[in-house]
Amino acid sequence: MAKKIISFASDFGLQDGSVGVVKGVISRIDKDILVNDISHQIPPQDIKYGSLLLMRAIQYIPQGVLLAVVDPGVGTDRKAIAITTDWGVMIGPDNGLLNLACATVGGAQKAYALENENWIIPHEGNTFHARDIFAPFAAGYASGELKLEEFGPELDLEDLKQYLIPLTDITDDEIKGEVLYIDEFGNCQTNISPQELTDKDYKVGDVIPIKIDNQELSAKWCETYKNETIGGIGIVIDSWGMASLFLSNGNAQKLLNCKDNSKVII
């Protein structure tokens, strides 16, 4: 396992220096650690968005250490944790942020609380655990200076917080799902799988009736983001294998005025 790589994701943005400070802490512990930035533009405090992003990214980033911080409960009694998997070690807050990524690589094996005082940076405030706790533990482990058993007490996996992807509700007549994720282009990924569409006898090229919240429309099932019905909504199976609503040369989210959790009925 390539332990000298830390992949880092957060909702910090790039304006106030938080990302640079965290990476600086890592470099001070071991300047040879490579930090791979996944994203720092996760919407603020959006654990759902962050967990979905990590679930997708974990399949393609190098094995080693994942440092992920979307932490609206920072400074409260929520635990700072490390989870071991076949992929490597995932470090972050115990708020459900990490569990989809863990499940994607075969599930959690062990979990530890980050409580070793020797690896916690002394601090006056209690609002920057990425700098004071997560980064030192991630760097210590990646460098080989800190063993997992030295992190702190082992935790019961069943006690860890979970975020679960909502399941579709399928009846004889309908597939009831929702919008999971909206990307930068306004494409709206749903929790509806291609198998669920084909089980209803839909196929590529079909025009499918859809209801989004209170809007009724039709969308053509396309193989790519090119829809010959210019200005029309299409359905494509996106790069993550889910049915996604798109607008050719446009922004489906703005046209439909939908959002995360918008109800989608086919």
Q: At which residue positions do the language-model features occur?
A:
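N-terminal glycine-/serine-/threonine-rich phosphate-binding loop
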Residues: 1-77
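Active-site histidine-anchored catalytic micro-motif
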Residues: 4-5, 29, 49, 60-70, ...
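Fold-independent oxyanion-binding glycine-rich loops
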Residues: 10-12, 38, 69-72, 85-86, ...
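A conserved acidic, glycine/proline-rich C-terminal tail/linker
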Residues: 189-257
